[in-house]
Amino acid sequence: MRIGFDHEKYLEEQSKYILERVNNYDKLYLEFGGKLLFDLHAKRVLPGFDENAKIKLLHKLKEKVEIIICLYAGDIERNKIRGDFGITYDVDVLRLIDDLRGYDLEVNSVVITRYSGQPATNIFINKLERRGIKVYKHEATKGYPTDVDTIVSDEGYGKNPYIETTKPIVVVTAPGPGSGKLATCLSQLYHEYKRGNVAGYSKFETFPVWNVPLKHPLNIAYESATVDLKDVNMIDSFHFDAYNKVAVNYNRDIESFPVLKRIIEKITGEESVYKSPTDMGVNRVGFGIVDDEVVKEASKQEIIRRAFKTACEYKKGYVDKETFHRAKLIMEEMNLKEEDRKVVIPAREYAAKLKERANKSETCTVVALELEDGTILTGRSSELMDGTAAVILNAVKHYANISDEIHLISPVILEPIINLKAKTLGSKRTALSCEEVLIALSICAATNPTAQVAMGRLPMLKGCQAHSTTILSTNEEQTFRKLGIDVTCDPEYISESLYYNN
């Protein structure tokens, strides 16, 4: 893989800049946008970026940092899903707490925002409290977003309970956008000043990258990733007016800046040190780019990937038609097409060939996989196994120089598994999934040296690209994710079944 980003340089620059910012205050509330862990988007568009860079940064500052996690009550009620992991936001909070503790980071509490006694939210609160985790409930702020006098009063932020913190940097994070991070930071700022403490607010958001051109593919890829939020990158006019320098930000931050500035000035009783939304940020990711061409190409591929993802989400009913069309439009505006993703054409051509040979109405899933050396392999679904499993077996055979004719998994192992699924468990779909095939392969590896060699090649699939001609089940997507394979799908179901497709 060609590297476009210097991870070590970025970590050094970023930690230094955060510490410089905290020196101005007794306490700094740092709003962390994007993903704190497993930032797969950043990893894809910035080759060389560590997906856990942010948490490693916090680990470096662990003596000075504690963490508050925000979760919007409405997201619990509607079971909002974190797309890259296929888990709900409330479950992601539990995962996040475990992961933060694994990095020796102190989790202060969980804040439920815009709380109004929702039943599912109460169950989640009970679950946390009974495991010894502090939970604070913040209701919707009266007067927000325009009535600053009410917002900054005992009727507004004053109604929220004060969260007791002890360290100079308080990181406020969440599973996703719209979780109430900013409101929590400002509420805390209000309470700090009421107590006579000098506190500050800053924002750490990786994208858009403020010191990269507006129409750079890296920033356009961010628009594509947030197409459901309708985010649009813009030139920060406040920054240009104050410093005569061009900086990129996004519409929500620019639109809310005048009110945000007034709220901060009302809380502190003095003029804000921030002249623009860009001033509020502490992001230094742009300084880690070492090969712009590599980043551009990776970002273009991400735009195509996002268009596929949005098309599938539209088919599943998760997003509206406007979001679907916008993702496609962003791709077309960059003069990109679906076929610019190398694995798309081989998958579609093989699927078309199979359809010609078989019943015209039958749909067969074909998965194409591009290896690091540029080789493209395919696998098809059959009565025995899914297309995902077939292509993985083909890939490990390729890496281990094992002939196609050699069976890696003994029928003695496969038949009892299929019988178990069909007869004992009564499953309608008896074809083995990718995960089931990998488990079967690992059993065979105990007695078959060839299978053992093939198993040893699985880590080589990390970073590979794949495309499926039909929508994959959540389970198949997660298996590919665990293997480190980026997969896209055509927005077609394998059958007309409504339930058994998944």
Curated annotation (Swiss-Prot):
UniProt organism field: Clostridium botulinum (strain 657 / Type Ba4)
Protein name, entry field: UPF0371 protein CLJ_B0384
Disulfide bonds: none
Stated family: Belongs to the UPF0371 family.
Pfam families assigned: DUF1846, DUF1846_C
HAMAP family cross-referenced by the UniProt entry: UPF0371
Domain of life: Bacteria
InterPro entries the record matches: DUF1846, DUF1846_C, DUF1846_N
